[in-house]
Amino acid sequence: MAGPFGFRENPHPKEEGIPPMRIYARASIIDEVNFDEMFLVTMCGMHFYKDMFGKAYPFRKYDQVFVPEHNYGAMENVGCVTFNENYLHRGETITLAKRLRFAGTNLHELAHMWFGNLVTMKWWNDLWLNESFATLLPFIAMIHSPRLAHFQPTCWVTFMQYTFWGVSTDQLSSTHPICTEIVSTDQAESLFDGISYGKGSAFLKQLYNVLGHETFKKGLHYYFDKYQWGNTTLPDFVGSLNQAWTESGDTSMGSEFDLPTWCDQWLKTSGINILEPVLTHNAEGHLESLKIKQTMGLRGNNRLRKQKISVCLFEQDGTQHIVSPVIVNDLDGTSVVQIPSGLNIKAVYLN
């Protein structure tokens, strides 16, 4: 970078596992930067990713630069991430929502130091593996970082904006599978869309839910141990997670469940699924039975998919009862939910 930039250095340079860090901005606007929060978010991310991936931050320094007229929101150059100056929100009231959004972008670019730079996709077919992971992991990092507790109450609400982007894109005639065939680099630009970011990260969130935190983390350790400083494909990634899943002995998805096949259902086909609660009430008007009916959207490959969800039951006074896990099968698309007896349920939420 060249130009009239000023910078601040990390005031906590001796914190274990943290490389030298600087934040740069044009000297004329440098006072607009919230240095304390940026350094805090970055350090929390480095600690969490080290634990999650089994590898410390892999480069010698980490600089972050606010650039005028940046073509993109941000770019994950090795050891020198660049951000559009619009993230400074100059002259605006800086709300918690805006701070959370930028913290997510900060952690997104930091995640690329592992997913993208330490391990790189072999070809554009697997662009989603870079972008989907870097979209989901910031929110898991916030939940597991006590020093970022101020973001935790609403961080998943912010994540849902990416999911809605994916849902809307997946209902267009131009939709495509998350992992799709790309024949040239010219075609690759079209993949930077709601499918690669939104639907892909939503799939990974369900994958994280299926495996559980510790098994998911163990699979990522296998992945980075084997493929660091190399190029990978979808089977490499799924194989590492499947190794951890098999070792866990978990049978919550059923004895016939095969993780690679399930991943292909989601990654290699397009289109949404719709889950609808079907309610039956007794003579007193109380909920007696609940079935979940799965149907297909109008666009895409039109297929049912196995899903692991939670169901929240609400009583009149707002008391919540969570039934989890609930497995929605991919054969007839229905699932029966066991309702606790003696409850006067007034609302049902499928998650």
Regions found by a protein language model. Give the residues of each.
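Hydrophobic alpha-helical and helix-loop surface patches within well-folded domains
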Residues: 8-293, 298-300
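Beta-strand-rich binding/interaction modules
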Residues: 255-260, 270-350
